[in-house]
Each structure stands twice: as structure tokens, then as C-alpha cells.
Amino acid sequence: MMTALSDPRFTRAVSDDGSLATPFMKCLARLVRAHDSYGLWKDKCDAELLANFTVTEEQRRAIPVIGDPEPDVLLRLDLFYAAVGVVIEERSGLLISRTLEISDEGIGRVLFTTRRLVVLSKTLRDVHRFGFNTLGKCAKTGTKLVKDAIKSIETYPDVARA
């Protein structure tokens, strides 16, 4: 269960350190807003929307080591990696295909491809505990994944465009 943003113990996790201004976090906020089909979140700021991506150490300790991923955690995981894919597309100008496979135990893999090139491959473990200590850490992780994928595309441009 995620804690509300107004809880003073967890406001540290959504501190305004400029991380919300990164292209990755803006994209993630757009994707979260796209899931608001009833307009319930239209008055919320990006920090409030993205606060669910933070899991403090106290919350992480409360989650069992072994467990099945909850649907809301799977949605956040899907949105996070969808944002990675969209930002890679925006920066490279190439169509990116994302494959996300998760087992019932919370182990899986995410794979990003374009044409014949695998631009990013990541093994996922403990998916039921997915989250970041702060939004800054979320932005840093997402931006690093995008940079790694762009580096692969720049290293093998012929394969990426084949």
C-alpha cells in the first residue's frame, strides 16, 4: 500500500530537486495522466502523480521478500519502462519495440529493440518491491537507461536502421 503524499514521513521522497523537469520524468507524468480516463487526477501536480513510484526503506521492509506482484505495482513497472521506450524513440527518431515479461514470482526481463538491434536488455528481480527511494533516483535511473540505449544505437547505427 502506498502512502499519501501529505504524510510528513515520506515528503522527503518527493523533494523538488529539479528531477521532475527531466524529459524522462515529464514523459512518465504524461503516461500516468493518459491512464486517467475519468479526469480524477487532472488537478494533481506531477509530483503527486509520480509519488507512487517512490517506496521508502520503511515501506520496502514491510513488503515480504517473497511475494506475488500486485496489479498496481505491475502498472507502475509497465509505465516506467514505457516511458523509457518513448524517450528513446523521441531522442533517436526510430521506432522502438518493448517486450516486458514477468513471471508470477516477480522475475522477468524487459527488452527494447529497433529493427535488428537490441538497444537495451534488463533482467528484473523482486518486481513486487519495485519503486525508488526518491523521485530523483527514479529520474536518474530512467535517464541512464535511455542514455545506454542511445549509446547502443549510436554505436551500431547500420544495424539500428537496417
Swiss-Prot record:
Keywords (A to Z) from UniProt: Nitrogen fixation, Plasmid
One family name in Pfam for this protein: DUF269
Stored InterPro entries: NifX-assoc_nitrogen_fix
Protein name (record): UPF0460 protein y4xD
Keyword Ribosomal protein attributed: no
Family in the record: Belongs to the UPF0460 family.
Gene Ontology BP terms: nitrogen fixation
